[in-house]
Each structure stands twice: as structure tokens, then as C-alpha cells.
UniProtKB/Swiss-Prot annotation:
Job of this protein: Acts as the catalytic component of the CCR4-NOT core complex, which in the nucleus seems to be a general transcription factor, and in the cytoplasm the major mRNA deadenylase involved in mRNA turnover. In vivo and in vitro, caf1 has 3'-exoribonuclease activity with a preference for poly(A) RNAs.
Name of protein: Poly(A) ribonuclease pop2
Record: residues binding Mg(2+): 53, 55, 174, 243
InterPro entries for this protein: CNOT7/CNOT8/Pop2, RNase_CAF1, RNaseH-like_sf, RNaseH_sf
GO biological processes: nuclear-transcribed mRNA catabolic process, deadenylation-dependent decay; nuclear-transcribed mRNA poly(A) tail shortening; regulatory ncRNA-mediated gene silencing
Entry-annotated residues carrying Phosphothreonine: 304
Keywords from the named record: Activator, Cytoplasm, Exonuclease, Hydrolase, Magnesium, Manganese, Metal-binding, Nuclease, Nucleus, Phosphoprotein, Repressor, RNA-binding, Transcription, Transcription regulation, Zinc
Cofactor remark: Binds 1 Mn(2+) ion per subunit. Binds 1 Zn(2+) ion per subunit. At lower physiological Zn(2+) concentrations, Mg(2+) replaces Zn(2+). The nature of the bound ion affects the speed of the RNA degradation reaction and, to a limited extent, base selectivity.
SUPFAM superfamilies: Ribonuclease H-like (SSF53098)
Protein family according to the UniProt entry: Belongs to the CAF1 family.
EC number: 3.1.13.4
Amino acid sequence: MTAMNSNFSYPALGVDGISSQISPIRDVWSTNLQQEMNLIMSLIERYPVVSMDTEFPGVVARPLGVFKSSDDYHYQTLRANVDSLKIIQIGLALSDEEGNAPVEACTWQFNFTFNLQDDMYAPESIELLTKSGIDFKKHQEVGIEPADFAELLIGSGLVLQEEVTWITFHSGYDFAYLLKAMTQIPLPAEYEEFYKILCIYFPKNYDIKYIMKSVLNNSKGLQDIADDLQIHRIGPQHQAGSDALLTARIFFEIRSRYFDGSIDSRMLNQLYGLGSTGSVLWHNNSSTPQIQFRDLPGAHPSPTPSNAGIPTTLTNTSSAPNFANSTFRFPPRVV
């Protein structure tokens, strides 16, 4: 990428003297999905940098057994949860390689169908999202079907294109939910296969958290990094559109401030918390591999399809909101 120019800006942000008459974040439901995807398709060639965030219903399951490494455990935790849960929001923010956003629109927040009566979730996650302004009644009534979104996304020019760069923050779960929607099958049994598929659909991607930790030894969350850089958030925290827009602005700021306008290619296609190899075996409370679900109120997990490759032995745990007896957990994503 080229260095960010001096005119870096996002339209209508409502801060630093920029007009706020038009919101930069466009809500997308089933009723306007085709219209908004058409707009994105008309812009992607000129604005081929896509910053992305998702909101999902928490973490409700963990694998038990023997694992090749801690990274293997982290991936199996991700896999068990993504295969069992439904996405709630996806946020996408477009810009060009200098960080300029389109005038027509710059950020889209896709809202997916979700039913609090039928779909599984972690209660504390839903409570947080509700406090952040997510309208679950509307999600139930006019939310987007993931398959409909995926069909349009595959043909949009955003994925399967080496010319498009994806920017994320602690993005293992984000990409996993997108891949699940596009492939319509459970995630691969092994991380190596997941990574191969990831690089087909998203051949060029940067994870800001990986970059900050690897180069600057900074493991702060998205909001804390924004505060350090004095970047103002637009929209509510813990909503995908706002987080995607903030991700975009942080990326171009750190690229300019710390990397002289060009990030080392070694940072490309690395996911924070996943991917390093190791031969040591990791144990987690059981000699028999299985998936352990939290004992949640309301909806309960359905057995994983046999072709998923995930062990389908389910065990109830206590109703406590954490896995106190778990040796490892996927690093919590802090925003």
C-alpha cells in the first residue's frame, strides 16, 4: 500500500469539524440488502480496502481432550462455537489505499436474523449487545438470512480477489463466521485447512491486534488503542458498523505513525491468537475428546452434524458464566 495522503478523511463523521448531517454507518436489513450490496459493488474497484468487524452471541462451548498445542485448543474452541452459534452483525467499511472513503457511503452494518427464544447465546453477551442498542426484536422480524448475504458477498468483488485488502482486529471469529456463511458447511477439523480456505476467500488481510502485539508489544483492545491515538469513535461501541469504521481509521493511523506508510509484508495474513505450530500435547480435563457446552437458559445446543468432524459427546457444566475449570481459553476480544 502507498503512504496515507494528507487529505485522509471519512465523510460525515461528525467530529473534528466534519459534517454529521449524514451518518457514515448504513444499517442493512433483509428489506434493503440487495440495494446496499449493489452500492458496495459499484464502489469496491475504487475503494478496495475493506475493514471488518462482527458481533456474535458470545462463547458457549469448549473442547475437552488432548490437543497438539495451545493454538490447536484455541482453534477447536473457535470451531465449536462458530459451528453452534449464529452471527448477529457484520460491519464493513470501505476506503482506498490512502485511507480515503467514498462520498456516497463508507460503512455498512448488516443485521442478521436472530431469535432470542430459539437461538443459542451467552446471556452476558446478549445483555451487553442490548445495552449497546442492538434491537433483537427487529433482528427477529427483518434480519438478513446468512445464506442470502453470502450469495451476494461471493459475487460482490469483495472476496476471492487479490486486489482487495481486508483489515480486522483480533479476527479469528470474524473470518470464521464469514467463511461459515459462504461455504454453508461446518468449519474444517484442523486449523491448517481453515487457513487454506481463509486465504482463498481473503488472500490479503491484516489483523491490527497481531501487528500491534508483534511489532509494538501492544496487546490493548480496539477502544484503548483508539484512545491512545486520539481517534474518536463514531456510533455505539459493540456494534459492528462502529467497530469496523474505527478499525479502518486505526489501521491508517498506525500505518502512517509507526510504519512510515508501509506495513511489513510479514504481517500479512496473520491471525492474532491462532496459527503457530507446536508438537507438544495439551490436556484439558479429559482423555476423551468431546465438546462441553455451558448449561444455558433457554435454547440448548443441537448435536453437531456428523460431517463436521467435531466430537458430538455433549456434557452439561455448571450454570456459572465462565469456564473456571478450563486450562485455556481463546484470548478474549476486547473492544
